[in-house]
Amino acid sequence: MAITVKGLTNKLTRTQRRIAVVEFIFSLLFFLPKEAEVIQADFLEYDTKERQLNEWQKLIVKAFSENIFSFQKKIEEQQLKNQLEIQTKYNKISGKKIDLLTTAVVLCALSEQKAHNTDKPLLISEALLIMDHYSQGAEKKQTHALLDKLL
């Protein structure tokens, strides 16, 4: 929270707002499929006094809810291509599946790009910051590789 002369404000950074969206998407991955309207209504319930939602976040969730299945398909297809590339290039099999947090971070980035046309370098850098926030150093490479090709 930012401190002002008058006291506390509830200004959140864009990264903190992205983290809130990633956490929402992550929690939702366990309960898919859902209708777009239901997902958007669920997000409104995610609003808290400490972390109030804004229109910027709502547009990201709207883009996510309307494109979830096509985004998931793109992620799966790109992950398979990446694994084949590793196998061809290094002659080793990468059986590592994409984890749910990485999926949520990538879905958030794809949704933000769709909703706000945010540029690729910023989205990748923010995604890596979010992975650091959750101490997911090992998954950062995978996240970066996916976003680099999907955005």
Swiss-Prot record:
It holds the Pfam family DUF1948. Gene3D superfamilies: NusB-like. It comes from the Bacteria. InterPro entries: DUF1948, NusB-like_sf. This is Uncharacterized protein MG027. It comes from Mycoplasma genitalium (strain ATCC 33530 / DSM 19775 / NCTC 10195 / G37) (Mycoplasmoides genitalium).
